[in-house]
């Protein structure tokens, strides 16, 4: 069973609209781990968050039996190593390494580049969109012949890449630019449908209407025009 003892205490400091927080919820839910969610205000950081993550001062933070772990990719690996049921990383050493590679690629390349679309206009925005599409094409090719980036079932890279499936593709609706058009990325759109068919994913992603309202509000606060 996922829960190894009745005395285990698992808490997650997160924020409901954060893709980095939500990926931890997905992993814990997939593993069947009970946890307490502590919603954080990222604009007014709590003393608890600053105490548990004094280095980065950011969410998410997983607290397992009083011990804090920060950074979402690190937390995901910890969860997989601690609760062995429903593994999200492959057993094969090469495949595990490649899962780590693609996860870092999503966070450090796709996410960082795609978020620059927000606030850009004209030729600057067009250049960012093209750069993002060039990066997304690597995922498009990886998905050929697969139901998920992890193969036949939901895995580590899929959980990480939900920020593409839901956050990026919802943000493009707000900014009025199709970064991931279906005619250019049919495999990614097929993969998104597969994600939406997964009960854990459906349970753990933010409700679309509330999420869109949040994105719009954030953009207004930053004086960024939406479509």
Curated annotation (Swiss-Prot):
Question: Which enzyme type, at the first EC level?
Answer: transferase
Where does the record place the GST C-terminal domain?
Answer: 92-215
Biological role stated in the UniProt entry: May be involved in the conjugation of reduced glutathione to a wide number of exogenous and endogenous hydrophobic electrophiles and have a detoxification role against certain herbicides.
Q: Which residues of this UniProt protein bind glutathione?
A: 18-19, 44-45, 58-59, 71-72
State the CDD domains in the record: GST_C_Tau (cd03185), GST_N_Tau (cd03058)
* UniProt GO cellular component terms: cytoplasm; cytosol
Q: Does the keyword DNA repair apply?
A: no
Enumerate the spans annotated as GST N-terminal domain: 8-87
The encoding gene: GSTU7
Q: Which family does it belong to?
A: Belongs to the GST superfamily. Tau family.
Which ranges of the sequence are coiled-coil? none
Q: Which Gene3D superfamilies match?
A: 1.20.1050.10, Glutaredoxin
Catalytic activity, per the record? RX + glutathione = an S-substituted glutathione + a halide anion + H(+)
Q: Which UniProt keywords apply?
A: Cytoplasm, Detoxification, Transferase
Q: What is this protein called?
A: Glutathione S-transferase U7
Q: Which domain of life is it from?
A: Eukaryota
Matches recorded under InterPro entries: Glutathione-S-Trfase_C-like (IPR010987), Glutathione-S-Trfase_C_sf (IPR036282), Glutathione_S-Trfase_N (IPR004045), GST_C (IPR004046), GST_C_Tau (IPR045074), Omega/Tau-like (IPR045073), Thioredoxin-like_sf (IPR036249)
Report a single Gene Ontology molecular function. glutathione transferase activity
Instruction: Report the subcellular localization.
Output: Cytoplasm, Cytosol
Q: Name one GO biological process term.
A: toxin catabolic process
- What Enzyme Commission number(s) apply to this enzyme? 2.5.1.18
């Amino acid at each position: 069973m996922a829960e190894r003892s009745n005395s285990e205490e698992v808490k997650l400091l997160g924020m409901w609209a954060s893709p980095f927080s939500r990926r931890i919820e997905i992993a814990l839910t997939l593993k069947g781990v009970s946890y307490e969610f502590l919603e954080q205000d990222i604009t007014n950081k709590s003393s608890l968050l600053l105490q548990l993550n004094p280095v980065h001062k950011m969410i998410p933070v997983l607290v397992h039996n009083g011990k804090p772990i920060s950074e979402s990719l690190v937390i995901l690996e910890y969860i997989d190593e601690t609760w062995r049921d429903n593994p999200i990383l492959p057993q094969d050493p090469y495949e595990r390494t490649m899962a780590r590679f693609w996860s870092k690629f999503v966070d450090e390349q796709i996410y960082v580049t795609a978020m620059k679309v927000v606030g850009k206009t004209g030729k600057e925005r067009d250049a960012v969109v093209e750069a993002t599409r060039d990066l997304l094409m690597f995922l498009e090719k990886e998905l050929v012949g697969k139901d998920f980036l992890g193969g036949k079932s939901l895995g580590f890279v899929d959980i990480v890449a939900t920020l593409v499936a839901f956050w990026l593709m919802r943000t493009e609706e707000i900014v009025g630019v199709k970064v991931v058009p279906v005619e250019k990325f049919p495999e990614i759109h097929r993969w998104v449908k597969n994600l939406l068919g997964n009960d854990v994913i459906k349970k753990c992603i933010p409700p679309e209407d509330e999420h869109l309202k949040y994105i719009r509000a954030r953009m207004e606060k930053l004086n960024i025009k939406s479509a």
